[in-house]
Amino acid sequence: MIHELKILPEYFDAVCLREKTFELRKNDRGFKVGDYLYLKEWDGEKYTGREVTRYVNYILYDWTGGLQDGWCIMNLKTSHLKATLDQTRGEQDE
């Protein structure tokens, strides 16, 4: 499954630079290992046009040390899904 999510600029940059390889989110979408996060930079008022896709390869659903119920931490890996999606869209337009 592909989840389209907003992300603030300071976090977006860190994800793009591979400095931030995790995402803490309310698990209101039923995130699962094997999903993709389609992260779209949001400046608080509008989308900036920058976007990146990451693959979810591990999820921590509960942690007695402080993760609240209904939240999860996802480990992110680089993904080439967006390039594949763009290529597929281009082929459909022909």
PLM regions and their residue ranges:
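Catalytic phosphate/metal-binding cores of nucleic-acid and nucleotide-processing enzymes, i.e., regions
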Residues: 1-87, 94
